[in-house]
Amino acid sequence: MRGQGRKESLSDSRDLDGSYDQLTGHPPGPSKKALKQRFLKLLPCCGPQALPSVSETLAAPASLRPHRPRPLDPDSVEDEFELSTVCHRPEGLEQLQEQTKFTRRELQVLYRGFKNECPSGIVNEENFKQIYSQFFPQGDSSNYATFLFNAFDTNHDGSVSFEDFVAGLSVILRGTIDDRLNWAFNLYDLNKDGCITKEEMLDIMKSIYDMMGKYTYPALREEAPREHVESFFQKMDRNKDGVVTIEEFIESCQQDENIMRSMQLFDNVI
């Protein structure tokens, strides 16, 4: 999506630093808030602890409230030092609004959470896996985190910037059904050759079972992931050529009510 030159030619991120409040300015309802926190816990650099509610922020003593940084002055020696410690600063807020389906306020909140976990402005695979593992202590999330990292790292340069992160998040949360299914296909297509093999699907499925841990599904047998994949792959590989194309993947998912319901769960996450 962006080359190395983009990560070296950086613009001022002051607009993204302008808010620590919740996305709408009001705390969400219980069910929406719970779903939002559950989803954000699955993503790096954007854990729910980075997004306090407005009521929590205002109720806290002044000394404990999140500090809202003043706008950076490029001519200030102090600000110049602060900026020099950041490896990557995202492009302008207006440009990110054009490229994603997030509002200005939403981008500010997402950037605050990202920067809290990734002060350098980018995250590599090892850091990504470390952050992700905090939310699945009962299992081994390392393999799934690697697959997810590669899906966010669209230009395959070994790092995920804030732009990479919000681009993927925008598709997952605000994209059309086809957009989301295309993103999911890319996640499963591990070698990025344009089709999904049974082995790739099995690798993903095993990583999910490993991540959830044996304590979550104690009754599952070791062969359960393979049986799951065999059943699912037979439905998707419509011409029985041993691979699933993007067309077969989308068509099969659109005809599965459970998958369609799961896609719609993300419509109002943020």
UniProtKB/Swiss-Prot annotation:
Domain of life the protein comes from: Eukaryota
Domain (EF-hand): residue spans on this chain: 81-137, 140-175, 176-211, 224-259
Modifications the protein undergoes after translation, according to the UniProt entry: Palmitoylated. Palmitoylation enhances association with the plasma membrane.
Residues that hold Ca(2+) 2 according to the record: D189, N191, D193, C195, E200
GO (cellular component) term, any one: voltage-gated potassium channel complex
Residues modified to Phosphoserine: S9
One example of a Gene Ontology biological process annotation: regulation of heart contraction
Binding sites annotated in the UniProt record for Ca(2+) 3: D237, N239, D241, E248
Binding residue positions for Ca(2+) 1: D153, N155, D157, S159, D164
Known function: Regulatory subunit of Kv4/D (Shal)-type voltage-gated rapidly inactivating A-type potassium channels. Modulates channel density, inactivation kinetics and rate of recovery from inactivation in a calcium-dependent and isoform-specific manner. Involved in KCND2 and KCND3 trafficking to the cell surface. Essential for the expression of I(To) currents in the heart. Required for normal protein levels of KCND2 in the heart ventricle.
Subunit structure: Component of heteromultimeric potassium channels. Identified in potassium channel complexes containing KCND1, KCND2, KCND3, KCNIP1, KCNIP2, KCNIP3, KCNIP4, DPP6 and DPP10. The KCND2-KCNIP2 channel complex contains four KCND2 and four KCNIP2 subunits. Interacts with KCND2. Probably part of a complex consisting of KCNIP1, KCNIP2 isoform 3 and KCND2. At least isoform 2 and isoform 3 can self-associate to form homodimers and homotetramers. Isoform 3 interacts with KCNIP1 in a calcium-dependent manner.
Name of the protein: A-type potassium channel modulatory protein KCNIP2
Source organism: Mus musculus (Mouse)
Taxonomic classification: Eukaryota, Metazoa, Chordata, Craniata, Vertebrata
